[in-house]
Design a protein with these regions (language model features):
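Charged, solvent-exposed interaction patches on well-folded alpha/beta domains
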Residues: 2-166
């Protein structure tokens, strides 16, 4: 059963057995067409959404098994639990990956980005958020971390439904 991650059986002298069962933990949702499944950290489907209590999991949008494996590799480099819990969705775009955070911030990344760069990215993100700055995207695909702030000066001066006020 894919819900079982590990089983350990020990014989305790003279005639006792100790059985330890470690269950797989929900890691993320997998979107396949219009269906959503819960997967573990190695990409095995093991539950439907309504079967788990933790609903704060990222959505993986993978077109095929290779994309899923690559996305899981990207996610495995995000060690910070606060960062991971802020991920809304991750998907492959051409040969790179886009991570969408809960507040709409986009992180552009690649499969070769390591955990240290993700740590630095999250620290930068937190400092910008604490200064009430809005980030459009953070790009980790280059040697240095690049970012683009949202231009808050652009406001909708048009009518409520988008039409000019004439």
């Amino acid at each position: 059963d894919v819900r079982i991650k590990n089983i350990e059986i020990k014989k305790v002298y003279p005639s006792e057995l100790v059985v330890k069962i470690e269950e797989s933990k929900p890691y993320s949702y997998l979107r396949q067409g219009n269906n959503f499944y819960v997967i573990n950290d190695v990409g095995e489907i093991f539950a439907y959404i309504d079967e788990i209590s933790n609903k704060n999991l990222p959505i993986i949008d993978a077109a095929n098994k290779d994309d899923l494996e690559d996305i899981l590799q990207v996610l495995s480099n995000i060690k910070n639990e606060n960062f991971f819990s802020n991920i809304s969705e991750i998907k492959k775009v051409k040969s790179d990956y886009e991570i969408l955070l809960n507040d709409g911030t986009l992180i552009k990344t690649s499969i070769v980005v390591n955990h240290t760069k993700y740590e630095n990215c999250f620290k930068l993100y937190q400092s910008l958020i604490s200064e009430n700055k809005k980030v459009e995207y953070i790009d980790l695909r280059f040697k240095d971390i690049n970012l683009k702030e949202r231009d808050l000066s652009q406001t909708n001066l048009e009518g409520k439904d988008g039409r000019d006020l004439k």
